[in-house]
Amino acid sequence: MNPVENLAALRAEMAKRRIDAYVVVTDDFHTSEYVGEHFKAREFLSGFTGSAGTLVVLPESAALWTDGRYFLQASQQLDGSGIELMRMGEAGVPEIPAFLHDNVPENGFIGFDSRTISNDFARRIGEKVSEKHIRFAGDEDLVDLVWTDRPALSCEPLWELEPKFAGYTRAEKLEKVREKINELGADVFVIPALDEIAWLLNLRGGDVLYTPVFLSYLLLERGKATLCVQKEAVSAEIEAHLAADGVALAPYDDIYPLVASLPKGTRVLLDGERANYRITQSVGTGVETIDRPSPIQLMKAMKHPVEQENERIAHIRDGVAVTRFIYWLKHTIGKEPITEMSAAKKLESLRAEGEHFLDQSFGPILSYGAHGAIVHYAPTEESDIPMEPHGFCLADSGAQYYEGTTDITRTIALGALTEEEKRIYTLVLRGHLQLGAAKFLHGCTGETLDMLARAPLWEAGLDYNHGTGHGVGFVLGVHEGPERVHWDVNRQKRHCVIEEGMIFSNEPGMYLAGKFGVRVENLVVVRKAEENEYGRFLALEPLTLVPYDRDALDLTLLTSRDVELMNDYHAKVYAAISPYLAGDELAWLKDVTAPVTFG
């Protein structure tokens, strides 16, 4: 079946139930950004494969909302589907609640699978449509009725992340989170977020490709904890270790009756942005709900010193692999056939040679030429093209190691470049260097820092339609919150102060449709710079250690400060990576990291 047929089948089920609009999100039951194959309902119905987007199906039409990272990709993948692309954030594009208000009749029904819609999203829809007495029909997953060959729920084995990697023991983390629960006046904390559960219990799994989490919910009380999980995924040894820390097991789907059975007078902590609508609707009468951001988010984001040191180790391993890849690509292009997919496989194989490599941290975004303008382009058998000894290769990739999670982008000159290509690369790199060198007072947020990265592009009347930075988990998701670097306060759901120990990306870019794309990305860790009578100053330490491409630079556009920053960074790269290279690779690294003279 194709998207047109899939939508027709869904509309037939909607008509049987008198449903006027059906909402299909990207999320799983845990509001995850990246989901297992079972949960790719929006992709099944629309054909759009991006990691962010919401589909609304009406009886005679459909629309899909996505953000600026995916405008070009979505326009291509939705072509011929009959689905209208809604470019989020652009003038005249309605938000989904307003669209539903305008397109669902009085006393109508909006359908969705209430296990996949966050409580906050359902609340915003409900508030907007209430004046028309529109009701929800959220008890049935209609997509499941029409997706006849739907993959089963993943159930991969759990494994333990030792404290020598994680820093805190499971018991220490449970104690710290219980302290937060008490501070918030709650008796029970319902935790649906997969990354938060994995972090808290020092467990990892394999139920989401590239993200080592496992399908589960956790009920944390003052004296006990209940992990709702597929028991087949838990070994007897891990079950015993959990029991020793006061964590009992229950079936995965028991979360709803467990929440419903909480006695009157119980105060339940729930994060309405992370909890699905069915969980919140399961809370019984007389039970008080405390809807607050999960305290685990910030605890997880502020990396333990042991995690930070492990991340440095992981990034040296990763830096060696990516540096060797760039050397191979530059010295092989034009001599042997190389395509986007073959280059991606080469990069993965080089990483796999490293110690403690577990997997990639996301599907590689490896593009050549015009494909680079598709921000999250991923090569497929159908889209794969050969690379030629000119223009840019944009390589955005990452890995999971026992020591941490990596994410790096390098835009690589494969030969001759146009003046425009060099100009854009240089402007992007200048912004990247400026943000990387930031020194700022504690209290700044990502909105404060973002302009440092965009300033060179803004001065030229240019911009990129994505955030400059996102948090990164520790052997977890390559995207995590609560920190985010983006200037537009209207896009921020929650404003987060940048704290010591946070790890986030520094990745400005620029994309010219039909021509090329440029992005340069390092991960950085926030460290204390100094404290004096003016306050506590923080700075950013680069974790990523891979050379920039001097072949892509227009040196006339660099300031003396730019050159100083680049030279300092390249000195760090050479010191960290050179001990692991030899022969021609080492000689090349020495050459490409040698100091540049200004002027």
Where are these regions (language model features)?
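Active-site neighborhoods and metal-handling regions in enzymes and metal-associated proteins
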Residues: 1-599
